[in-house]
Amino acid sequence: MTTELPIAVIALKIKAQKNISNFRRNPDFFASFSFFYNKLLMDLYEHPGCLEIKQHDNNIIIIWNLKEANAESILEKHKTIHKILRETNKNFPRCPINYLIVLEAGICNIIQLQHNRKAPAFIMQSDMIERTQKVLSSIGEAKYPHIMFTHDFYKLLPAKIKEKICCPYYFFHICCYSFKPHR
């Protein structure tokens, strides 16, 4: 059985500000990242719209159900993420961290499986996570804003927030936006 579900994805890439961002070669980064990730899990899983949080290396993917949360409330979580970052850097001054963030939205196909206790209950088919990873890798290598919205996420934002957003950027034919720089 297949079900369509509107979702949003927050993709984060956590990096050490001054040191190498590798868990094995930089134990201070591992400690900072672990603290940040634990605080993030405790805060975000309380929200009814949070479906899943995945971590791979220094990347974190947060999947939101758009039936339970709107784009504006998901964008508000950026403030929570930034607050957790400040707390992490205060507790781990030897390895301060920063992040890049990409927000994406779209329809995900969920395929229910006949499962036993060892198999997953469902498979989510979507290219949204792959697209966010491509944008994260592009903005991580250059002087771009640390937060980007794909066009699909941008369309869901209210007009009052769209007024604060500037011209588009293009990565691998993916249109993205960011906030206007402060003067």
Model-derived segments and their meaning:
Residues 51-55:
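A short pre-motif secondary-structure segment
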Residues 17-20, 60, 153-154:
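A generic structural signal for short hydrophobic patches within well-formed alpha-helices
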Residues 1-2, 120, 131-134, 140-183:
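Intrinsically disordered, glycine/charged-rich C-terminal tails and inter-domain linkers
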Residues 1-49, 182-183:
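Juxtacatalytic helix/coil linker segments
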Residues 69-72, 110, 123, 144-147:
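Catalytic cores and conserved motifs of cyclic dinucleotide signaling enzymes
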Residues 109-113, 156-159:
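Switch/connector loops and helix/strand junctions flanking conserved nucleotide-binding motifs
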Residues 31-50, 62, 66-101, 105, ...:
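Alpha-helical scaffold within the catalytic cores of cyclic-nucleotide enzymes
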Residues 75, 111-140:
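Catalytic-core segments of nucleotide cyclases and related cyclic-nucleotide turnover enzymes
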